[in-house]
Curated annotation (Swiss-Prot):
Residues 34-41 are annotated as: G1. Coiled coil: none annotated. Residues 113-116 are annotated as: G3. Belongs to the TRAFAC class translation factor GTPase superfamily. Classic translation factor GTPase family. CysN/NodQ subfamily. The lineage of its organism: Bacteria, Pseudomonadati, Pseudomonadota, Gammaproteobacteria, Enterobacterales. Keywords: ATP-binding, GTP-binding, Nucleotide-binding, Nucleotidyltransferase, Transferase. Residues 92-96 are annotated as: G2. It comes from Shigella flexneri. Its EC number is 2.7.7.4. Residues 25-239 form the tr-type G domain. This is Sulfate adenylyltransferase subunit 1. NCBIfam families: CysN, PRK05124.1, small_GTP. GO terms for biological process: hydrogen sulfide biosynthetic process; sulfate assimilation.
Length: 475
């Protein structure tokens, strides 16, 4: 057993008391990103090692793995703690997003270790979508690279406001203050073009040697700031969704017997209480909240991020994908929107194409009306393009098959985030963040009914020799 964990349990007076204490700790989700070989996996391994979160059998296995797959000679290769795929260990790189969990006396953490290779940028975007802070690693020998800029832009695009720039491998530049200062100035020059109000911090460190990771480095007396762990433990995270109006997307209708009918899902933003008047969109029907059912029993009030089942006073027609909000709020349905897109497929995104769209439990179809621009990651300039290639990032105009209730992604990631799904292969090919919904007055209405479009898709899928045209794509 982990001796630190055993000591913590003993200090709390038993397992039950320790678990209660864990529930009251704040949780920080963060990711590590940067260019390939900047030391992301090694940094996470060092954090786990120096906070003594590794079990004895894991440490023994790490010693053996370091001899077989390690790249650090006689030293422990801490990157092997998170590089779990065989291909990752053989190549010495991260391919998939690896999640790790650890806690200190002050906070709980969920880490997403994301790939650095450009071809795995889509994996990085996936990891960033649920995080509140990003650690951007920079190799002190190389400085700010294209992938550093790319990952910085994607992180801010996905709503991350806290960036920790970890200038790694300081041991390979003799712990030079001049090198640290130069890289910091280079990054700040670039960061001035990033959108939003950002909290940017810089930490010089060596993940391999442990300098400024969990303890202060004696090799860099010129740095008097916080260690990386201290930054993670003390950064104040203000969730945007807490201050936003109530949004409750219905995931499914919970009807275990004839006496109970509830609507299950996660409260995306705001708060809801028993007796509150709510409105169902897109129907516009209103009712009152009779009960709020949770895993721990009925509650009088719940807040954003909690999984709940709402029971209403009236028997009304509600299905998966519908949205509940405060009755006094006017939120019109829209049929068009401009969307920031991270494209994840080999086949480029082009105007005229149509895809299945999934947003907050709702699935519908959308047509690409046009691509306004693609962002040049090197300097964040916008350039006109005919299509959006793999790993491309740009602003796209979409028209949906039916009216949808949308928020801007920066206001509400749940009701403003969507994915593109290929209609034939059912593969996720892109991620979208609603930039601006277009009012219903200017949105184009669909020429065909949902039944006609579904029938058209089935005919083209099963009888391609008939040569039926794509109704949504050809409009």
């Amino acid at each position: 057993m982990n001796t630190v964990l055993a000591q913590q349990i003993a200090n709390e007076g038993g397992v039950e008391a320790w678990m209660i204490a864990q529930q009251h700790k704040s949780l920080l989700r963060f990711l590590t990103c940067g260019s390939v070989d900047d030391g992301k996996s090694t940094l996470i391994g060092r954090l786990l090692h120096d906070t003594r979160q590794i079990y004895e059998d894991q440490l023994s296995s790490l010693h053996n793995d370091s001899k077989r797959h390690g790249t650090q000679g006689e030293k422990l290769d801490l990157a092997l703690l998170v590089d779990g795929l065989q291909a990752e260990r053989e190549q010495g790189i991260t391919i998939d997003v690896a999640y790790r969990y650890f806690s200190t006396e002050k906070r709980k953490f969920i880490i997403a270790d994301t790939p650095g290779h450009e071809q795995y940028t889509r994996n990085m975007a996936t990891g960033a979508s649920t995080c509140e802070l990003a650690i951007l690693l920079i190799d002190a020998r190389k400085g700010v690279l294209d992938q550093t800029r790319r990952h910085s832009f994607i992180s801010t695009l996905l709503g991350i406001k806290h960036l920790v720039v970890a200038i790694n491998k300081m041991d390979l530049v003799d712990y030079s203050e001049e090198t640290f200062t130069r890289i910091r100035e280079d990054y700040l020059t670039f960061a001035g073009q990033l959108p939003g109000n950002l909290d940017i911090r810089f930490v010089p460190l060596s993940a391999l040697e442990g300098d400024n990771v969990a303890s202060q480095s004696e090799s860099m007396p010129w740095y008097s700031g916080l260690t990386l762990l201290e930054v993670l433990e003390t950064v104040e995270i203000q969730r945007v969704v807490d201050a936003q109006p109530m949004r409750f997307p219905v995931q499914y209708v919970n009807r275990p017997n004839l006496d109970f009918r509830g609507y299950a899902g996660m409260l995306a933003s705001g708060r809801v209480e028993v007796g509150q008047r709510v409105k169902v969109l897109p129907s516009g029907v209103e009712s009152n909240v009779a009960r709020i059912v949770t895993f721990d029993g009925d509650r009088e009030e719940v807040f954003a991020g909690e999984a709940i089942t709402l029971v209403l006073t009236d028997e009304i027609d509600i299905s998966r994908g519908d949205l509940l909000l405060a009755a006094d709020e006017a939120l019109p349905a829209v049929q068009s929107a401009s969307v920031d897109v991270v494209w994840m497929a080999e086949q480029p995104l082009s105007p005229g194409q149509s895809y299945d769209i999934k947003i907050a439990g709702k699935k519908t179809r959308a047509r690409v009306d046009g691509i306004r621009y693609q962002v040049d990651i090197n300097n964040l300039t916008q350039r006109e393009v005919e299509n959006l290639p793999l790993n491309g990032i740009g602003l796209v105009d979409l028209t949906f098959d039916e009216p949808l209730v949308l928020d801007r992604y920066q206001q509400n990631p749940v009701t403003g985030g969507l994915i593109f799904i290929d209609r034939l292969s059912n593969v996720t090919v892109g991620a979208g963040m609603v930039h601006e919904p277009v009012s219903q007055a200017t949105a184009a209405s669909s020429e065909f009914s949902a039944f006609e479009l579904e029938l058209n898709a089935l005919v083209r899928r099963h009888f391609p020799h008939w040569g039926a045209r794509d109704l949504l794509g050809d409009k």
